[in-house]
Amino acid sequence: LLVMPLTPFEIMMAKIWANGLAVLIGVTFALLVMVQQVLKVPIAGSLPLFLAAAACYLFAAASIGIFLGTLSRSMPQFGLLVILSIIPLLMLSGGVSPRESMPQLVQNIMLAAPTTYFVRLAQAILYRGAGFDVIWRDLLAMTGVGACFFTVALLRFRRAVTQTQV
């Protein structure tokens, strides 16, 4: 990786979108074939809008993953960081249990997690047929959180690459 003529930004974007594209293809298949055809569950909203929101979520989630990778020195340490951070993010985002049943402090802390916004906007699009005019705030917040994690991860990754080249 260090001898390739790529910048840390290009390496990170390739990592995010290579995996993200595979996930988006899987999500599209699951919604069109499994949900609509096999299970006969109608989707109320726009599939392209949902996929665009899912792409933004994948960017945010992958940015958190890369950030955690810059904090850890080994794969076992990274695994422990994932257990301590990603699992609570998923459990407290509103997808497993309603956010309204959580203490206000937890609800406020979870506003720093992109999963919270994605759960809200995915439910709005898929269940209620919401359009961009309804979900844009959640989409902007989710993308902003992802951009913050991406920026910090990029700075840390650049520093790590620079230190290993010296």
Spans of features found by a protein language model:
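Short polybasic/polar patches that bind polyanions
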Residues: L2, Q37, L126
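Short helix-to-coil transition segments within interhelical loops
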Residues: L1-P8
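Structural detector for helix-capping/boundary residues
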Residues: M4, A14-K15, L155
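Membrane-embedded alpha-helical segments in integral membrane proteins
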Residues: T28-V35
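Alpha-helical transmembrane segments of multi-pass membrane proteins
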Residues: F9-G26, L49, A141
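Membrane-spanning alpha-helical segments of multipass transporters and channels
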Residues: L21, L32, V41-V166
